[in-house]
Amino acid sequence: MFLQIAACFTVIGLLYGLVSNLQQNRRLAASLPPGPPGHWLFGNVPPKNFPFIRFAELTEIYGPVFTLRFGRRIVCVVGRHQAAVDILVKHSAETTDRPRAIAASEMLSQGFRILMTPAGERLKKYRRAFHTCLQPSAAATYKPIQYNHAKNYILDCLHDGKCHLEHGRRYAASVVMYIGYGKTTPTSYSDPEVQEVNKCLGRLSEVIKPGAYLVDTYPILKHIPGYASHLWRYGREELALYTRQANAVRKQLEKDEAQPSFAAYLIENQERLGLSNDELAYLSGAIFGAGSDTTAAAIAVMTMAAACYPETQARVQAQLDEVVGSDRAPTFEDEEMLPEVTAFVLEVYRWRPVSAGGVPHRSTKDIVWNGYVIPKGTEIIGNLWAIGRDPELFPDAEEFRPQRWLNENGRIRDDLKYPVFGFGRRVCVGQHVADQSLFINTALALWAFKISQDPAKPIDVLAFTDTANIRPLPFTLRFEPRVKDIEAVLEAHLD
């Protein structure tokens, strides 16, 4: 009897949603930016694979901003740089919000994950907490640990280049475990706590993809007994994991054995920050979620680009030889004198952006753009893949060309920007730490090695995972030492 009643209410709810959807679509269609036609009732079908590539194709057809409709959801996809500035930067106050993400946020993350936290008091206190530990001055204090782990990455590649992807993941995991929880010993990607966190992140990458779960289009499904019950179970497992990690730091603090860390800061200031135990656990775990997989993927893209574009690699190495030489390793203090390295990093971000599809925003007011009206409640996606292929700013976009970031004096251009870390008030709070990681790993890798492809196993530069944050599929590299006694030079500088 209960199931019959539930089914009846489900049908009624779906019918109501469909009728409301039809009325809404007729009212809004005239004012929205154009887009591909869809079913008169259900709208468009979400792309099954690599949505950011399909959205980039639609940008070529319909222009800088186009509209999709998924049931009652209206989605505007932004695929050009100036349109992104006009909508997501100039209207930052009206686009700080996130759309309701029932599967990924409410069910999988129990509403605690900062990535999908809507605008409001929780987001404000989350960002206040992050600001203290990730602002530029705080990020600079992590440089010594980043430097030493980057040197270990080079030594790992020297001794076992076949596992270069694993070495990049180890670097990223070691740094974020230090920042997040104060762990000072080298971290392996195979460590149990790292594997558990990465399992959670893998689940998120699948759930957050557009169209992955019908409940995001028809919210009533959330209340159907048994629907996607595994998401609730995964959410409980994830919260338990982050709680265990935070509690371990609590015990260290009680014994006066804790290293400085983000988790320790949150615990010591929990009352002042107004954080519940669950919020604190999720927030401390967010450091790993935001910084591990993304940093490792970007390092992999850096080595891929170096191998596939040897002339570009050689240009960076010429400057490294001039500024640094071979008697010592490059350091953060050399950054100002190494614009070729910085340009290489900026091009890595643009060429293969890890968060290629961007994270959706939600408008809280009507936004007028180029005569169109993007109504309140619209989901707005800044498609980083398409924006990085804006022909007005990035001609020959598929070419990896760091020189596009340099002016006639060989310095980094002030007039060219790429929003790899997001837009407006939702920009990634860990951007400064990420920039530091990419700079020092790029400088050390190109100083130490000539990186090349294996002729028997050419690299497919489009072979990436189909996940929310993309990463290269396994590929083979050769690491030929450029510096005599690399190990001795590096170990002489290891702290």
Swiss-Prot record:
GO CC terms, sorted: membrane
Record field: transmembrane: 2-22
Record has Heme as a keyword: yes
Cofactors required: heme
Record membrane topology: Single-pass membrane protein
One Pfam family recorded for the sequence: p450
Record pathway: Secondary metabolite biosynthesis
Keywords: Heme, Iron, Membrane, Metal-binding, Monooxygenase, Oxidoreductase, Transmembrane, Transmembrane helix
Source organism superkingdom: Eukaryota
Known EC number: 1.-.-.-
Signal peptide: none
MF annotations from Gene Ontology: heme binding; iron ion binding; monooxygenase activity; oxidoreductase activity, acting on paired donors, with incorporation or reduction of molecular oxygen
Residues given in the record as heme binding sites: 428
Listed CDD domains: CYP64-like
UniProt-annotated location(s): Membrane
Assigned protein family: Belongs to the cytochrome P450 family.
Function text: Cytochrome P450 monooxygenase that is able to use 4-ethoxybenzoic acid as a substrate for oxidation.
Record's protein name: Cytochrome P450 monooxygenase 113
Source species of the chain: Postia placenta (strain ATCC 44394 / Madison 698-R)
